[in-house]
């Protein structure tokens, strides 16, 4: 992505580099009005970034938070009308000076000023800003409250509905052009485009169309509606480091072993310490998701179990620990099953987290992979971890804290029917024969042909 400069950046991280930090104060259309960095010799004014920190957590909704102190201020940086005011968007970038003298920055997020504090003393003029995630402009914190209940009809394109919400006029919440709540177009995954789901009434619909009518609360906000629409997809949603709303699939998040590695840590180099914590009470190895019930009393369901014998928390090691979740707006077995497998992965690793103390790095992103070479163990095994969040100082000095979970602990989920029998078997229950979707069955002249053998009412597949 950054070609030669990117490689130089990665190499420079291993040296005693000079840290860069920059705040860009944005116009409503996203263009830069003016900037402020951590250099005392700022060309625009004598003001500079004195101190601060950034905290990021992987979750739907608000993810990023910044506390920052500006020193040696002049009047241009007062929190006042026509200067830095309510709704001001500020982009934070961090980086370093490359060996050839080039300034190299990586965006860390676009924020809004939430709680400004100004201090005036003899010879001192500074301000402390609490910058909140751009999500605050749509969740009611700093904007985004709706005038009443907001509805999205079944059959509506979910991505189009999200985009139209962000285009609402921030002054009157109408659809008129001119002052959109978010001038930056959202980024949507293509994962769902060619996928369908079968609803409990037997109909098949595209995954990117709303399977049911959605209605927000009377006191709702745009963020609430977007979360409700993302829930229809069981998707991740939040603002990325460039300040763009992004919708990512949780379904392809299940196999994190295939993701690229952001950094390979070794103790004594960029890694200064590791802490492991276990919380067995928060672990579950059996997840049942119960969805909506249609007019014919058919309920959408999904179930996933950890039967992976390589997992420390599999059923055969610790016994069955079940978590039952009610998702009243899930109208298809496919969606319930995808959500069950995703939650199983989360519950399997909740009880085992790792915290790393490292040197500062600016390309670390939530929901991506880092590795740790455990040279203190025989064979120096490599551990893979999924980043859940981090905290990093904005100043030149100080260490970074990364919170992660072990990818090695993610189990291979086994899809099961609600009676606990794995889906590689056919189940005969009364007048109903349950056939796994992964196996084709032929019908000829009213005769159903299935490869397998029957024992105690269970037909085991010959080639599951």
Task: Go through each PLM region and give its residues.
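Surface-exposed cap/loop segments at beta↔alpha junctions
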Residues: 1-20, 56-65, 72-185, 414
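Acidic, small/polar-enriched beta strand-loop surface segments
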Residues: 1-41, 224-227, 231-388, 393-395, ...
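Assembly/interface hotspot detector across virion components, adhesins/toxins, and nucleic-acid enzymes
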Residues: 24, 95, 192, 196-198, ...
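Short beta-strand and beta-hairpin "edge-sheet" elements
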Residues: 48-49, 96-131, 238-239, 370-403
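Oligomerization/assembly interface segments of phage tail-like spikes and tubes
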Residues: 54-76, 124-137, 289, 325-327, ...
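Charged- and aromatic-enriched interaction segments used to assemble
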Residues: 102-105, 119-279, 435-436, 453-455, ...
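Short coil/turn motif common to extracellular beta-sandwich-like domains
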Residues: 428-434
């Amino acid at each position: 992505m950054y070609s030669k400069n990117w490689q130089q950046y990665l190499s420079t991280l291993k040296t005693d580099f000079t840290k860069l930090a920059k705040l860009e104060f944005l116009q409503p259309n996203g263009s830069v009005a003016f900037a402020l960095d951590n250099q005392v010799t700022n060309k625009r004014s004598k003001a500079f970034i004195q101190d601060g920190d950034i905290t990021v957590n992987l979750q739907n909704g608000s993810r990023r938070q910044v506390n920052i102190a500006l020193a040696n201020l002049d009047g241009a940086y007062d929190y006042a009308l026509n200067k830095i005011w309510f709704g001001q968007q500020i982009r934070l970038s961090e980086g370093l000076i490359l060996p050839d003298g080039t300034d190299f920055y990586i965006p860390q997020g676009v924020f809004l000023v939430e709680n400004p504090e100004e201090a005036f003393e003899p010879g001192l003029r500074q301000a402390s800003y609490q910058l909140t995630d751009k999500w605050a402009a749509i969740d009611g914190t700093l904007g985004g409250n709706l005038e009443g209940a907001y509805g999205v009809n079944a059959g509506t394109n979910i991505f189009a509905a999200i985009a139209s919400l962000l285009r609402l006029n921030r002054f009157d919440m109408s659809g008129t052009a001119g002052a959109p709540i978010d001038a930056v177009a959202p980024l949507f995954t293509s994962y769902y485009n060619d996928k369908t789901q079968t609803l409990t009434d037997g109909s098949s619909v595209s995954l990117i169309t709303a399977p049911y009518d959605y209605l927000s609360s009377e006191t709702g906000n745009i963020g609430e509606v977007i979360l409700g629409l993302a829930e229809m997809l069981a998707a991740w949603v939040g603002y990325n480091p460039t300040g763009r709303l992004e919708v990512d699939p949780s379904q392809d998040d299940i196999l994190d072993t295939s993701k690229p590695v952001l950094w390979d840590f070794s103790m004594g180099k960029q890694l200064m310490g590791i802490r492991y914590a276990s919380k067995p009470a928060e672990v579950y190895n059996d997840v049942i998701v119960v969805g909506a019930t249609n007019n014919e009393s058919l309920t959408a369901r999904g179930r996933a179990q950890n039967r992976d014998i390589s997992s420390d928390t599999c059923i055969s090691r610790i016994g069955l620990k079940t978590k039952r979740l009610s998702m009243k707006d899930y109208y298809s077995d496919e969606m319930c099953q995808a959500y069950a497998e995703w939650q199983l992965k989360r519950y399997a690793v909740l009880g085992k987290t790792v915290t790393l103390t490292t040197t500062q790095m600016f390309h670390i992103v939530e929901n991506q992979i880092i590795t740790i070479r455990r040279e203190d163990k025989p064979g120096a095994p490599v551990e893979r971890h999924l980043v859940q969040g981090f905290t990093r100082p904005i100043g030149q000095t100080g260490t970074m804290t990364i919170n992660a979970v072990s990818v090695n602990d993610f189990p291979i989920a086994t899809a099961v029917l609600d009676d606990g029998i794995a889906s590689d078997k056919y189940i005969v229950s009364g007048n109903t024969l349950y056939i796994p979707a992964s196996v084709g069955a032929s019908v000829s002249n009213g005769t159903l042909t299935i490869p397998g053998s029957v024992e105690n009412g269970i037909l085991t597949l010959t080639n599951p």
